[in-house]
Protein backbone atom coordinates (compact mmCIF):
# COMPACT_ATOMS: atom_id res chain seq x y z
CA UNK A 1 0.00 0.00 0.00
CA UNK A 2 1.47 3.35 -1.06
CA UNK A 3 1.27 5.61 2.00
CA UNK A 4 1.94 8.64 -0.21
CA UNK A 5 -1.24 8.05 -2.23
CA UNK A 6 -3.82 10.73 -1.38
CA UNK A 7 -6.63 8.18 -1.04
CA UNK A 8 -4.60 6.12 1.41
CA UNK A 9 -3.74 9.18 3.50
CA UNK A 10 -7.39 10.32 3.54
CA UNK A 11 -8.64 6.87 4.52
CA UNK A 12 -6.11 6.56 7.33
CA UNK A 13 -6.86 10.09 8.54
CA UNK A 14 -10.63 9.51 8.69
CA UNK A 15 -10.13 6.21 10.54
CA UNK A 16 -7.76 7.88 13.02
CA UNK A 17 -10.19 10.76 13.60
CA UNK A 18 -13.06 8.32 14.04
CA UNK A 19 -11.11 6.31 16.60
CA UNK A 20 -10.10 9.48 18.47
CA UNK A 21 -13.74 10.53 18.73
CA UNK A 22 -14.77 7.04 19.85
CA UNK A 23 -12.06 6.97 22.55
CA UNK A 24 -13.47 10.14 24.08
CA UNK A 25 -16.85 8.39 24.38
CA UNK A 26 -16.22 4.75 25.25
CA UNK A 27 -13.48 2.35 26.39
CA UNK A 28 -11.08 1.13 23.71
CA UNK A 29 -11.97 -2.48 24.54
CA UNK A 30 -15.61 -1.76 23.58
CA UNK A 31 -14.75 -0.07 20.25
CA UNK A 32 -15.22 -2.40 17.29
CA UNK A 33 -13.72 -2.29 13.82
CA UNK A 34 -17.25 -2.64 12.44
CA UNK A 35 -18.46 0.46 14.31
CA UNK A 36 -15.37 2.45 13.29
CA UNK A 37 -15.87 1.52 9.64
CA UNK A 38 -19.58 2.38 9.72
CA UNK A 39 -18.92 5.78 11.29
CA UNK A 40 -15.98 6.54 8.97
CA UNK A 41 -17.87 5.25 5.91
CA UNK A 42 -14.98 2.91 5.13
CA UNK A 43 -15.39 -0.69 4.03
CA UNK A 44 -14.04 -3.25 6.52
CA UNK A 45 -11.92 -4.82 3.78
CA UNK A 46 -10.35 -1.40 3.22
CA UNK A 47 -9.69 -1.07 6.95
CA UNK A 48 -7.83 -4.38 6.92
CA UNK A 49 -5.75 -3.29 3.91
CA UNK A 50 -4.33 -0.52 6.10
CA UNK A 51 -4.41 -1.98 9.62
CA UNK A 52 -3.94 -5.40 11.16
CA UNK A 53 -6.48 -4.62 13.91
CA UNK A 54 -7.81 -1.74 16.00
CA UNK A 55 -4.66 -1.74 18.17
CA UNK A 56 -2.61 -1.11 15.03
CA UNK A 57 -4.87 1.87 14.25
CA UNK A 58 -4.51 3.09 17.84
CA UNK A 59 -0.73 2.97 17.47
CA UNK A 60 -1.04 5.22 14.39
CA UNK A 61 -3.22 7.61 16.41
CA UNK A 62 -0.47 7.81 19.02
CA UNK A 63 2.08 8.59 16.29
CA UNK A 64 -0.10 11.43 15.03
CA UNK A 65 -0.65 12.84 18.52
CA UNK A 66 2.98 12.91 19.67
CA UNK A 67 5.95 15.05 18.70
CA UNK A 68 8.67 13.45 16.59
CA UNK A 69 11.19 11.71 18.80
CA UNK A 70 14.08 13.59 17.17
CA UNK A 71 12.66 16.85 18.58
CA UNK A 72 13.09 15.66 22.17
CA UNK A 73 16.22 16.23 24.25
CA UNK A 74 17.35 12.88 25.65
CA UNK A 75 19.08 14.51 28.62
CA UNK A 76 15.88 16.40 29.47
CA UNK A 77 13.77 13.28 28.93
CA UNK A 78 15.84 11.42 31.51
CA UNK A 79 16.26 14.25 34.02
CA UNK A 80 12.83 15.89 33.78
CA UNK A 81 10.42 13.39 32.22
CA UNK A 82 7.33 15.09 33.65
CA UNK A 83 8.32 18.42 32.09
CA UNK A 84 8.98 16.76 28.73
CA UNK A 85 5.71 14.81 28.59
CA UNK A 86 3.55 17.90 27.83
CA UNK A 87 5.93 18.72 24.96
CA UNK A 88 5.58 15.22 23.52
CA UNK A 89 1.80 14.83 23.71
CA UNK A 90 -0.54 16.77 21.43
CA UNK A 91 -4.25 17.34 22.04
CA UNK A 92 -6.49 15.41 22.45
CA UNK A 93 -4.18 12.58 23.62
CA UNK A 94 -4.15 13.68 27.26
CA UNK A 95 -7.96 13.80 27.35
CA UNK A 96 -8.14 10.42 25.64
CA UNK A 97 -5.71 8.91 28.15
CA UNK A 98 -7.75 10.23 31.09
CA UNK A 99 -10.90 8.73 29.58
CA UNK A 100 -9.13 5.40 28.92
CA UNK A 101 -7.30 5.20 32.27
CA UNK A 102 -9.10 2.01 33.34
CA UNK A 103 -9.02 0.24 29.97
CA UNK A 104 -6.24 -2.36 30.11
CA UNK A 105 -6.19 -2.88 26.33
CA UNK A 106 -5.67 0.83 25.70
CA UNK A 107 -3.05 1.16 28.43
CA UNK A 108 -1.06 -1.81 27.11
CA UNK A 109 -0.81 -0.24 23.62
CA UNK A 110 -0.09 3.17 25.19
CA UNK A 111 2.82 1.81 27.22
CA UNK A 112 4.13 -0.18 24.25
CA UNK A 113 4.01 2.94 22.10
CA UNK A 114 5.97 4.98 24.62
CA UNK A 115 8.50 2.18 25.10
CA UNK A 116 9.15 2.27 21.34
CA UNK A 117 9.14 6.08 21.42
CA UNK A 118 11.91 6.08 24.05
CA UNK A 119 13.84 3.47 22.06
CA UNK A 120 13.68 5.83 19.05
CA UNK A 121 14.88 8.73 21.22
CA UNK A 122 17.82 6.63 22.45
CA UNK A 123 18.68 5.16 19.04
CA UNK A 124 21.63 7.44 18.23
CA UNK A 125 22.67 8.14 21.83
CA UNK A 126 25.56 6.60 23.72
CA UNK A 127 25.23 6.46 27.48
CA UNK A 128 28.09 6.29 29.96
CA UNK A 129 26.17 3.53 31.75
CA UNK A 130 26.19 -0.12 30.66
CA UNK A 131 22.44 -0.42 31.25
CA UNK A 132 20.87 -1.76 28.02
CA UNK A 133 18.76 0.84 26.20
CA UNK A 134 15.82 -1.57 26.12
CA UNK A 135 15.88 -1.92 29.91
CA UNK A 136 16.33 1.82 30.35
CA UNK A 137 13.37 2.55 28.06
CA UNK A 138 11.19 -0.06 29.72
CA UNK A 139 12.02 1.17 33.22
CA UNK A 140 11.63 4.88 32.46
CA UNK A 141 8.28 4.42 30.73
CA UNK A 142 6.80 2.12 33.34
CA UNK A 143 8.03 4.24 36.24
CA UNK A 144 6.63 7.34 34.56
CA UNK A 145 3.26 5.62 34.29
CA UNK A 146 3.58 4.53 37.93
CA UNK A 147 3.96 8.14 39.03
CA UNK A 148 0.75 9.10 37.22
CA UNK A 149 -1.09 6.08 38.66
CA UNK A 150 0.17 6.94 42.16
CA UNK A 151 -1.32 10.42 41.84
CA UNK A 152 -4.60 9.04 40.57
CA UNK A 153 -4.90 6.22 43.09
CA UNK A 154 -4.13 8.46 46.06
CA UNK A 155 -6.00 11.46 44.64
CA UNK A 156 -2.91 13.67 44.72
CA UNK A 157 -2.08 16.69 42.61
CA UNK A 158 1.70 16.97 42.48
CA UNK A 159 3.23 19.57 40.16
CA UNK A 160 5.70 18.52 37.48
CA UNK A 161 8.72 20.10 39.23
CA UNK A 162 8.04 18.04 42.36
CA UNK A 163 7.44 14.91 40.26
CA UNK A 164 10.78 15.45 38.51
CA UNK A 165 12.48 15.89 41.90
CA UNK A 166 10.92 12.66 43.22
CA UNK A 167 11.99 10.87 40.05
CA UNK A 168 15.59 12.07 40.42
CA UNK A 169 15.64 11.05 44.09
CA UNK A 170 14.34 7.57 43.35
CA UNK A 171 16.57 6.89 40.37
CA UNK A 172 20.24 7.57 39.89
CA UNK A 173 19.79 9.75 36.81
CA UNK A 174 23.40 10.96 37.05
CA UNK A 175 24.52 7.44 36.11
CA UNK A 176 22.60 7.81 32.84
CA UNK A 177 24.63 10.73 31.50
CA UNK A 178 24.80 10.97 27.72
CA UNK A 179 28.30 10.75 26.27
CA UNK A 180 29.20 13.75 24.15
Regions found by a protein language model. Give the residues of each.
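Append "Primarily bacterial transcriptional regulators
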Residues: 15, 34-39, 47
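HTH DNA-binding helix-turn interface
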Residues: 2-3, 23-28, 41-59
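Cytosolic nucleotide-binding catalytic cores of signal-transduction proteins
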Residues: 2, 24-26, 39, 128, ...
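Short, basic, alpha-helical segments at the C-terminal edge of helix-turn-helix-like DNA-binding modules
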Residues: 32-33, 62-74
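C-terminal peripheral helix-coil segments that are non-catalytic and often amphipathic
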Residues: 153-180
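Hydrophobic alpha-helical connector segments
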Residues: 71-102
Amino acid sequence: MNDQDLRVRKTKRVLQQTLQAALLQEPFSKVTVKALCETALVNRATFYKHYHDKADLLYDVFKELTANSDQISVAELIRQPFSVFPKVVKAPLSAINVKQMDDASFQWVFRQYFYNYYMECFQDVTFKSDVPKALLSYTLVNNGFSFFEWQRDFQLDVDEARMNAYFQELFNVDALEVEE
